[in-house]
C-alpha cells in the first residue's frame, strides 16, 4: 500500500512537472510569436510583387525583419500562406509581433503609400515620382494620362493642369489608371462652382488660370506677389500685348536654370515663347499649386503692364505702368547682373 502511494505521488509529480514545462514552453512560444516584436529602430517597408511565390515571401520576411521576420516566415509556411493575397506594400512598425506581421500580410492588409509632390514642374517628372513610389512605372502612368485626360477635355499640352500638388495616399498596387483618375478627381473637386465662377469673371477657363498660375510661380519666389503677377499677365492679354514672360522662354529652351535671357533665347521658335507669340502659351509650364491658383482668382485689379526682377536678387519684382518706367527698372537690374558678371 505504501509502495503504491509512493508511485502515485511520483507520477503526480512527474505529470505536474511536465505540465509546468509544457505551459512554460507554450508561454515562451506565445511570447516569442505573439508578444515579442520587430526590434528595428524604425518602421520597415516590405514590398511583395504579384509574381512572388510563397517561398520567396518567407525569405523576404526573414531577410528584412530579422528574428521576428523569421518567426513570421515560419507561421507563413506552417499556415500555407497564399501568395496571391499578399501582393502589396506593408509598413512594419517596431514592436509588431510575428503573428501580427503574418496576419497583416496573409490578409493583404496593405499600408497606404504617400505620394507627395510640391515642386514638380512637368507631367514627366510626376510620372517619374509615381514610378518611384508605387509599383507601376512612369511609362504606364503617361500611357494612362493619354487614355484618360483627353476624355476629360485636356489637350496633350494641358495635362499639367489636370493635377494639383499635395499629399495623396494610394495602395502600392494601384493601377496607373486609378492614380490618374484619383489625382484628376481631386482637381475636379478643387474647381468647384465658386472657383469656376471667379475664373469666368476674369474671362478665363480653369485651364487658362492654371497656365497663368504656372508662369507666375516660375516668375516670382514671393508667394505674396503671385496674384499681382498673374493679374499683370491678364492685363497684357486683354490689351492684346504679348506676355513677354521670361519663364516661358526658359520652358521653350528647356532650361529653367538660365539666369539671363538673351537675344538668342528670345528668337527660339516655340508656341511657348511669349516674346514671339501673342496670348497665352498652349499649356502650363509647370504644375501650378492651389495657393497660386487661388491668388490669381482672388487678385485685385491693378494698372501694371510691366515688371522686372528687383536688382537686389530677392526674387521679387518692380512693377510699372509705363514702358519708360519699366526701362528704368530694367536698367537697374541689368547693371546688377553686370556687376555680378552674370552672363
Model-assigned labels for residue ranges:
Residues 244-286:
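Conserved SxxK-family serine transpeptidase/carboxypeptidase catalytic domain
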Amino acid at each position: 500500500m505504501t509502495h503504491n502511494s509512493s508511485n502515485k505521488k511520483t507520477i503526480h509529480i512527474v505529470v505536474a512537472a511536465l505540465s509546468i514545462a509544457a505551459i512554460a514552453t507554450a508561454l515562451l512560444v506565445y511570447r516569442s510569436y505573439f508578444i515579442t516584436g520587430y526590434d528595428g529602430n524604425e518602421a520597415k517597408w516590405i514590398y511583395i510583387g504579384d509574381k512572388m511565390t510563397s517561398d520567396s515571401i518567407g525569405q523576404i520576411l526573414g531577410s528584412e525583419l530579422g528574428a521576428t521576420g523569421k518567426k513570421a516566415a515560419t507561421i507563413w509556411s506552417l499556415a500555407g500562406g497564399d501568395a496571391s493575397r499578399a501582393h502589396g506594400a506593408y509598413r512594419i512598425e517596431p514592436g509588431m509581433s510575428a503573428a501580427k506581421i503574418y496576419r497583416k500580410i496573409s490578409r493583404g492588409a496593405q499600408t497606404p503609400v504617400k505620394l507627395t509632390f510640391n515642386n514638380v514642374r512637368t507631367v514627366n517628372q510626376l510620372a517619374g515620382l509615381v514610378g518611384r513610389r508605387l509599383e507601376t512605372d512612369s511609362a504606364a502612368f503617361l500611357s494612362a494620362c493619354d487614355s484618360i485626360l483627353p476624355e476629360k477635355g485636356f489637350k496633350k499640352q494641358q495635362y499639367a493642369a489636370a493635377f494639383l500638388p499635395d499629399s495623396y495616399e494610394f495602395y502600392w498596387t494601384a493601377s496607373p489608371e486609378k492614380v490618374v483618375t484619383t489625382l484628376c478627381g481631386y482637381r475636379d473637386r478643387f474647381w468647384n462652382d465658386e472657383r469656376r465662377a471667379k475664373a469666368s469673371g476674369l474671362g478665363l477657363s480653369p485651364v487658362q488660370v492654371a497656365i497663368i498660375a504656372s508662369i507666375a510661380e516660375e516668375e516670382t519666389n514671393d508667394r505674396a506677389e503671385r496674384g499681382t503677377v498673374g493679374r499683370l499677365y491678364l492685363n497684357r492679354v486683354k490689351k492684346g500685348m504679348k506676355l513677354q514672360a521670361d519663364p516661358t522662354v526658359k520652358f521653350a529652351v528647356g532650361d529653367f536654370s538660365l539666369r539671363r535671357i538673351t537675344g538668342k533665347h528670345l528668337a527660339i521658335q516655340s508656341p511657348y515663347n511669349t516674346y514671339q507669340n501673342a496670348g497665352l502659351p498652349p499649356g502650363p509650364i509647370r504644375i501650378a499649386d492651389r495657393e497660386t491658383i487661388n491668388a490669381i482668382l482672388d487678385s485685385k485689379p491693378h494698372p501694371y503692364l510691366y515688371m522686372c526682377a528687383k536688382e537686389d536678387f530677392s526674387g521679387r519684382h518692380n512693377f510699372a505702368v509705363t514702358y519708360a518706367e519699366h526701362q528704368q527698372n530694367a536698367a537697374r537690374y541689368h547693371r546688377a547682373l553686370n556687376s555680378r558678371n552674370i552672363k
